[in-house]
């Protein structure tokens, strides 16, 4: 390390054994020791964090993976960041491979943009930088008042396709829905493979026909000039499911950023099987797998589900041999090294497209 800069430490937020394991892999690659801290739940349910060594004037990196108990993991991260801030750490960088609440980054009716709220909370707790991977929406980076490095897992997943899928040249990249078409196209172009899109899978939201008016005058009942009436939207109809592209006699590789609704991937696999695909792979960066996921995957036409270790899924993997894991500790450790030494991050994005 550059002797002109301060030291650095890597801490695990200790939400799960998987978080500690990822932190150990990162520190081994960096040739560093894991910072000493204790994170535990008190008898009253509160989270307590104790930092067991001096961090004054150092760059601190907090590794936090997000298990199924999202809110506990978020509180662990916030409390640890605040503890390090009060201990006079120079910079506090959160290494959050899967950023929670990223699916709540848009306003929907009377909902809220929870992702923006979380960004504000992290800044208030003391974080000065975040390293994450494959944000669900790239616009989320604009929610933060400090730098966010959004790394990509696509080079690792592309390498897996080339090295672990026999006869991958006979494959076609599949988008489970039109929303995932750009990501699928990016994979298809770099592998020089065909592209298919499953259309009609997306569920339609219920149309709210109540206009919410309660105050006079009742304009709706008044005589108005033809053409000035507010147009009523037609009720949405769910289109029949179709596959745009040929998958007959091919290997189908479904790509997405998150697997959290396994049923939709199983349904897509069944459609592809009906269309003639003889092998089906599902690949995603984040595998947020429920307790039922192993059984659903095992009973489905899916041959393999390939995810990275951004989210803990060890128990599900033991229950289903179809689930495979790609380690991304290499890129996280290199990002930590470069940020601490003030080096450019451009090299980590050299094989990335805007649609990844």
From Swiss-Prot:
One of its GO terms (biological process) is nucleotide biosynthetic process. The keyword Magnesium does not apply. Keywords: Acetylation, Nucleotide biosynthesis, Phosphoprotein. Pfam families: Pribosyl_synth, Pribosyltran_N. GO terms for molecular function: magnesium ion binding. The modification N-acetylmethionine is found at residue 1. SUPFAM superfamilies: PRTase-like. The modification Phosphoserine is found at residues 177, 215. It comes from the Eukaryota. Belongs to the ribose-phosphate pyrophosphokinase family. Binds to PRPS1 and PRPS2. Seems to play a negative regulatory role in 5-phosphoribose 1-diphosphate synthesis. This is Phosphoribosyl pyrophosphate synthase-associated protein 1. It comes from Mus musculus. The lineage of its organism: Eukaryota, Metazoa, Chordata, Craniata, Vertebrata. The gene is Prpsap1.
